[in-house]
Amino acid sequence: MKPIWDKGKPVNELIQKYTVGRDREMDLMLAKYDVQGSLAHITMLQSIGLLEKDELTALSAGLKDLLPVIERGEFVIEDGVEDVHSQVELMLTRQLGDMGKKIHSGRSRNDQVLVDLKLFTRDRLRGIVNSVKSLFDILIKQSDRYKDVLLPGYTHLQIAMPSSFGLWFGAYAEALTDDMLLLRAAFDQANRNPLGSAAGYGSSFPLNRQMTTDLLGLESMNYNVVYAQMTRGKMERNVAYALASVAATISRLAFDACMYNSQNFGFIKLPDDCTTGSSIMPHKKNPDVFELTRAKCNRIQAIPQEITLMTNNLPSGYFRDMQLVKEVFLPAFQELEEVITMTAYMLDHIKVREDILSDPKYDAIFSVEEVNRLAREGMPFREAYRKVGAEIENGTFKADHNIHHTHEGSIGNLCNDRIAARMESLTAAFPFSSIDAAISRLTSK
């Protein structure tokens, strides 16, 4: 098939292969959203007189027929076809003749791929939000379950003060609430309509941009047509930062889990079927899941920088550099969802040791408790600090394992209910139901 930009001159196959690259492979992920965007666009075209009602009916039916094909994984971009936009138009043209070519009126592939990317991102962020919430629920459950089980707290990898599994699980739960804030900001950037910006400078057709915004359930539009094109790359980068924030939280948790599972710490134990073995050492039970999770999370954290390097030296307007952003951006959602799902599974099956601080080597961890006790009894804090320090040095310190932390967020007052309420408020604010209603109206037969 000739490219849709064909002007009647021979196509250099070497150039064609190089410029298309992996675009057909990547664009398969966008097929459903290309159909949704096209349905909104042709509905708007009919409203301004660029399509007849019978043409809209035929084109809509043809587009809607593609959706189950896409859902079944049977949609393909044929050899010689550049991208998903060209494939959809080709299929309509085969079915409807020249009428199929009318769907491109008032539109460029620039704003077409932009809306595809935004609809894709909006949808996949929803999956991430739901997965993060599921992981959060398990962390809160485990925090409540093990709230009274003490754990050494570390600074500089030196034993520091008493902590608890309640604090440890709860810390990562609250971390996810801040990550959710970034996911919401990313979602809001994706939930704006670039359709009508065409190649980046608008159209002489009297396009109704508000109509396509409403039909797609988008919150608003990218008003300035030049800026609409400038969101290409920027939107992906900022969304990638939100994904990276989630990945950073999980990566840190994975490191803790690997360390706590080692024999030198022995704070947690993984079920045998959640570990792997060695080909030479029969005693090994390796935490490979958490190690791979850590590596995958670090790879995800590199994506914003990779996108930045592709886009940070470009002036306004569209450039083909943007095509390569899809290769690192589109697959990131599935990888992060798999990471979150596996992390939730592992944490739900983890076993904790309940007598860790009974080991005398951790006695010094209670030194601050003793300093504070002496200070409460009237001894100046610095004098109490020196007294307890001297006792530790000469081996006369007697640890009192009874701790009394009552302030908000401490061992004795985790505030998990408040943390859970914050997460509930954040997730409830996503407008998923209104989006579902809009897309259902648009795509129903």
What are these regions (language model features)?
Residues H104, R109-Q112, H156-S163, L167, ...:
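Alpha-helix capping and helix-loop boundary segments enriched in small/acidic/polar residues
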Residues A61-V69, M230-G233, A390-G395:
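A short structural micro-motif
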Residues K118, R122-V129, K133, I140, ...:
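Short amphipathic alpha-helical segments with heptad-repeat character
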Residues M1-G37, D98-M99, G266, M281-K445:
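Glycine-rich cofactor/substrate-binding loops
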Residues L216-P304:
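Acidic, glycine-rich loop-and-beta core segments that form the ion-binding/anion-interacting portion
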Residues M1-G202, L207-T213, S220, T276-G277, ...:
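A helix-coil-helix interface module used to build multimeric assemblies
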Residues T43, S47, P68-F75, T93, ...:
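Charged/polar positions within long, soluble alpha-helices
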